């Protein structure tokens, strides 16, 4: 979606520079892109570096980057995340362009009572309903943050929604189920209670087996939701040589022997996170099965590499196309990974 929006903006504003940022970039490309964005719209950016620039990004822009936008347009999301996003708006003292002297954030929403399908799938409709009802036309940050967030998540007060319709009640119940699932999942990763035995050191303090009823037994996840699938993204040219995508005309990657430590570190930095649906229950088995089979077939020698033996490789052709579990993939250094389902 971010890629489609970026393309539309570039078409509408041909003289502007549009930079896109999302999770489906190879690690090295993403690092370069983060550095570029920080330089262009970060704390030390200049009027010249900011002029005529449009940044299109997903939630990854919320993570750690000290960005400072003149104007923001965002999709509706839960209140705490929305307020976090606005923290990147007029973040530092600087002279703003004419007409943008006052910080303004435009929140995209549906014209009826429905919600964007992607946002509803990620956050659930209940929190979006409450955020929509509570969001004021004017915000004072940070003083407004505590009350707005508290009201959004206070299940004892639904006055902002008026009389609950059947649709609202259904969304509320779905949110309870979603929250309960998250709570049960989090319980699997609780630190064990401290022992009263004297003299016990901290060694093993964080050890805690995953409970048998955990749906992702054996996988110690760090985020909610479906498991993500990370691959090492490489290219196989027409001569059958394996290369780094970023400099496909230069670096050749060994497939018939364990790579040296320097080579292994370079390969490990080519990690790419696949779109979320590859991690869904109905897709993940086929995805992992194909990745493991192809990795074993081409890179069996890597089993002797401590850094790479647990990794799976996704090979793109020289045009940077690949097929994975019935999905056509294409990688572009400027726009990242795109896909087309069969």
Place the predicted regions along the sequence by residue.
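C-terminal helicase lobe and adjacent C-terminal extensions/tails of nucleic-acid helicase motors
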Residues: 1-45, 69, 73-342
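Short amphipathic alpha-helical segments, especially helix-boundary/capping motifs
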Residues: 10-13, 59-63
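Conserved two-lobed SF2 helicase motor
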Residues: 47-62
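Flexible glycine/serine/alanine-rich "lid" or loop that lines and gates the nucleotide-sugar donor pocket
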Residues: 66
């Amino acid at each position: 979606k971010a890629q489609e929006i970026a393309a539309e903006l570039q078409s509408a504003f041909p003289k502007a520079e549009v930079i896109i940022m999302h999770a489906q970039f190879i690690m090295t490309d993403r690092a370069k892109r983060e550095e570029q964005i920080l330089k262009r719209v970060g704390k030390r950016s200049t009027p010249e570096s900011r002029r005529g620039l449009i940044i299109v990004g997903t939630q990854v822009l919320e993570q750690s980057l000290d960005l400072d936008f003149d104007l923001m347009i965002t999709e509706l999301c839960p209140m705490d995340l929305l307020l976090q996003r606005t923290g990147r708006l007029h973040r530092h003292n600087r002279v703003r362009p004419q007409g943008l002297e006052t910080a303004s954030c435009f929140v995209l929403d549906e014209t009826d009572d429905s919600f964007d399908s992607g946002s509803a799938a990620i956050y659930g409709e209940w929190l979006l309903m409450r955020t929509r009802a509570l969001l004021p036309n004017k915000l004072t940050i940070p003083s407004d943050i505590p009350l707005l967030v508290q009201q959004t998540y206070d299940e004892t007060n639904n006055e902002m929604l008026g009389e609950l319709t059947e649709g609202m009640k259904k969304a509320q119940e779905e949110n309870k189920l979603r929250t309960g699932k998250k709570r049960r999942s989090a319980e699997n990763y609780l630190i064990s209670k401290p022992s009263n035995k004297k003299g016990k050191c901290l060694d093993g303090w964080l050890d805690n087996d995953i409970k048998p009823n955990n749906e992702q037994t054996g996988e110690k996840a760090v985020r909610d939701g479906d498991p993500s699938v990370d691959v090492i993204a490489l290219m196989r040219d027409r001569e059958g040589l394996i290369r780094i995508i970023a400099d496909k005309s230069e670096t050749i990657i060994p497939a018939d022997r364990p790579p040296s430590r320097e080579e292994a570190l370079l390969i490990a930095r080519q990690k790419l996170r696949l779109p979320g649906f590859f991690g869904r229950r109905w897709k993940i088995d086929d995805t992992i099965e194909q990745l493991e089979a192809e990795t074993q077939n081409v890179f069996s020698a890597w089993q002797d590499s401590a850094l790479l033996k647990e990794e799976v490789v996704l090979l793109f052709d020289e045009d940077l196309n690949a097929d994975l579990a019935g999905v056509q993939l294409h990688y572009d250094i400027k726009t990242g990974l795109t896909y087309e389902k069969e």
